[in-house]
Amino acid sequence: MDIRAAEISAILKDQIKNFGKEAEVSEVGQVLSVGDGIARVYGLDNVQAGEMVEFPGGIRGMALNLESDNVGVVIFGSDRDIKEGDTVKRTGAIVDVPVGPELLGRVVDALGNPIDGKGPINATRRSRVDIKAPGIIPRKSVHEPMSTGLKAIDALIPVGRGQRELVIGDRQTGKTAILLDAFLNQKAIHDNGPEGEKLYCVYVAIGQKRSTVAQFVKVLEERGALKYSIIVAATASDPAPMQYLAPFAGCAMGEYFRDNGMHALIGYDDLSKQAVSYRQMSLLLRRPPGREAYPGDVFYLHSRLLERAAKMNDDMGAGSLTALPVIETQGNDVSAFIPTNVISITDGQIFLETDLFYQGIRPAVNVGLSVSRVGSAAQIKAMKQVAGSIKGELAQYREMAAFAQFGSDLDAATQRLLNRGARLTELLKQPQFSPLKTEEQVAVIFAGVNGYLDKLPVASVGKFEQGFLSYLRSEGSAILDAIRTEKAISDDTRGKLTAALDSFAKSFS
């Protein structure tokens, strides 16, 4: 056998040349103690605040407390499989989630993983969950309406694109129903509206029952509204860090639309539960407690989240992110810590009351206490024309109704005011899942403020409204089109609307 030294040395040299020098260096630490979803880790000296770290078995966590001798890590998932002495690896990445149109129609958890069984999400972009809100220069004041389809809100407490409007009330007063109707109301624009008007919806469920979230998704799906919505769910059985993270994750998904010149609406349901889970994490991390045992930065938790909802100026693409945070009160106590915090952060609030709900006034909006700090800037001119007087009349009605309980002999003017107020209150009622287009709301409220309901018994107001709307849709669609395109009630339209009301009122009686 002939051994050629030159050939062998050539092969060896070749192999040496191709020898890989890459060795993966990862910074690791050791678990000192673990319990209640919190791990104390030794090592990881260069870890960043908010960085994702990895435990054995693929469980992830987020470094929140950076102390002199250890790192406090909150665990996204079960801590049962983590034990003392386990190796913890740095990922080098701050917590981020997938964003983009690929998420529309899907249900994801707080880290953006799909939980609806419809396969993986092929999103190409990712975004950090906790980024700084836009400054003052890139913003523009709110001036376009964000129609919810609810007469009581669109007429009296209008919400604009880029606004933060708080929905606050006790349990079972219809807070989620308002969010759901606002989502369903966008269907008409998505089906045949211009691209620039479309409003994409993000619903963040925090600490709710899985059955409740499933019901919400089912309603959206049945009514064709899931295709433009993203659902982020951190349910009651999920660990506290997931419930804390979910609103930030949903916000990052909504910001994608805002920053690309589109419009998005995000509902946080509800932020009281996020504050509770943040309190749990903070106390377990041994941060000092403050009022009601919440940590000192619970105001900052909500303010940095809600400040990210904004209307951008034209140079930034003129997109917007509108936020509808929900807060649940205990026994109508709006002066508790978290409710007062969020009221002071938002641009107005919609108060829902149990008493009104049980009186059959639904949506149970207390029109006297609810405000929108953007106001009529977020309404089209037609709505301003009819809704301006309804506010004043309802305010007078509430004042008179309080006095009328004592006096029996009322003069004719007071009696007229009370009658009108009762009928307008009846007019603002609306069944669930039946949002109205803005032009239809305008027509109905026009009838109310111009005295067409005054002669009707209060019980027939709803029937009159339904009848008049179907009459307009069949006979007077030109009137509705005129209000929609002109965005105002011209003298010509006013004449036609009055004529239509006269002819319908004759046939109705």
From Swiss-Prot:
Signal peptide: none annotated. GO terms for molecular function: ADP binding; ATP binding; proton-transporting ATP synthase activity, rotational mechanism. Pfam families: ATP-synt_ab, ATP-synt_ab_C, ATP-synt_ab_N. It comes from the Bacteria. SUPFAM superfamilies: C-terminal domain of alpha and beta subunits of F1 ATP synthase, N-terminal domain of alpha and beta subunits of F1 ATP synthase, P-loop containing nucleoside triphosphate hydrolases. F-type ATPases have 2 components, CF(1) - the catalytic core - and CF(0) - the membrane proton channel. CF(1) has five subunits: alpha(3), beta(3), gamma(1), delta(1), epsilon(1). CF(0) has three main subunits: a(1), b(2) and c(9-12). The alpha and beta chains form an alternating ring which encloses part of the gamma chain. CF(1) is attached to CF(0) by a central stalk formed by the gamma and epsilon chains, while a peripheral stalk is formed by the delta and b chains. This is ATP synthase subunit alpha. It comes from Rhizobium johnstonii (strain DSM 114642 / LMG 32736 / 3841). The gene is atpA.
